[in-house]
Amino acid sequence: MKKTEGKPLPFGATIQKDKVNFAVPVPEGKEAALLLYRVGEETPCMSWPLEDSVGEVRCLALEGCDPAEYEYNYEIDGEIVPDAYARAYAGKEVWGKETKASDHTLRCKLYDEPYDWEGDKQLHIPYHKVIAYALHVRGFTQDASSKVAHRGTFQGIVEKLPYIKELGVNQIQCMPVYEFEECTESHLNYWGYGKAYYFAPKSAYAADGNGIKGLKDMVKACHKEGIEVVLEMPFSSEVPGQVIGECLRYYMMEYHIDGFILNPMLISIESVSADPILKTTKIMQHREDFQGTMRRFLKGDEGMMEAVTYWLRHLSEEDHIFNYITSHTGFTLKDLVSYDEKHNEENGENNQDGPDYNNSWNCGIEGPTRKKSILSLRKTQMKNAFFLLLLSQGTPCILAGDEFGNSQKGNNNVYCQDNAVSWLNWSQLSKEKELHDFVKVLIALRKEYPLLYPEKEMTGADRTGRGVPDVSYHGEEAWRAPFERTSRQLGVYYSAATREEEECFIAYNMHWTKHDFALPILSKGKNWYLRASTQDGVLTEPSLLKEQKKVELPPRTVMFITGR
């Protein structure tokens, strides 16, 4: 093995034809060395001083260094440290096992592994056609009830792809899959937030410990089923914007990732979106405006009409957002309708952690109950929540497990819970089959009507010259929106571009009393048909309404009507 002059870029270990280049930032005046280990050994077999520098980057190249035979770390100012730019790490293959570079149990791998993508590419599903599904790689299948062979892994997700595809989803959003430290001084880091090794997929998320191949296999399998893969990348505040951009480009090019969810407080979403390499990659952010508005409307708060009308029609792409009523940071949907207060006692922080204001409503009793009237109301509210999410025109995202009533027992902050509290309980699927099937056909219904996912945001103007605005709002009187503060009901009419196409009218009654809705008069030859409602579910065939001028909605009911 021979030491030669190295290059300062790219950072990390770069395998070339006959040598490996090492480049690492080192503060000025600090001594640094490269440590080499035989694969699997915890004692360095060689040490090479890092003397050449460009700025504060030390670099060297080693001719004759076989990537299959060696692992490495750095020694900087007397401290053993891993390479933050490494593509894979040894010692992290087992979830929950504490390893560290200081005792050589954590080492960097020299990645040089060809992969056959079989012609795979990013899917580029149009933003307005996306139906997203948010999950935690481990929590999605770790529970024995998942009945997969490789629980809590990328492979577990692949085993569940038939389920995901049948549901109607075409994008999965994964919580952090990079190599984070799950064992911290204060708590278990289940979610993966905080400092991490961002360039390396998590080894413990692969059944065989090979996170690189595991993530690639999952992405390729998802793409074959027409499902995009989006990664949440909540970089810590210490990571420079330049490194964030480099990391995102790496995952897009090396792993064919379709999109990223970023923290706009740390990096400009607009600047990342303008990156020439990432120009056609979805760059997104969490925003809770839709969530807060629809939760309050769902439970019957007053004064919500203006916000509701905006979020029913607002498209997501321009703002780099997506609509959700529940997410990992808060209650599941089942808990949203079952608890008024958070119950985070198991987190060990005296119930002081997690959001205090959840805009939830327990329907009359806190937590589990056998009272049939309460259970029926909760089921109604969950269906209404899915109506609000899937019939809004922005891009919807379902929290994994909500479609079958998964519960976290009132815990709205499971960041440290790696157990049955945070894992999906798949046994609920058979118990809540009716809810699951309702969600599945509601997703199919959304896809059936392009008026529910337009390419351009509707404005209330007559764009087609038919004399009818593209979107209008109605109440007990047609063309008169009930915008009074006490109103908890709204009719929304989406007009078709041509006389031949179907019209859509959605009546939302979140009030605890019944309300009449006046129906706009259709063009000659068309009639109003019931297509779906909270009570009836999604009808296999549209049912002609006996009354064509108005419709009565029971309390807490949504009705979807089409004009044809």
Roles of regions detected by a PLM:
Residues 99-101, 268-405, 413-417, 450-453, ...:
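Conserved alpha/beta catalytic core and glycan-binding cleft of carbohydrate-active enzymes
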Residues 1-133, 138, 159-168, 375-379, ...:
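Carbohydrate-interacting/catalytic domains
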Residues 138-172:
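A conserved hydrophobic secondary-structure block that centers on an alpha-helix together
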Residues 131-133, 172-174, 229-231, 260, ...:
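Hydrophobic faces of well-ordered beta-strands that scaffold small-molecule active sites
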Residues 223-228, 233-288:
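Active-site neighborhood of glycoside hydrolase catalytic domains
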Residues 165-186, 330, 340-342:
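Carboxylate/His-rich catalytic cores and anion/metal-binding grooves
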Residues 128-147, 194, 232, 362:
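N-terminal small/glycine-rich loop or linker at the start of catalytic domains
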Residues 146-152, 180-224, 237-254, 346-367, ...:
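Aromatic- and acidic-residue-enriched carbohydrate-binding clefts of CAZyme catalytic domains
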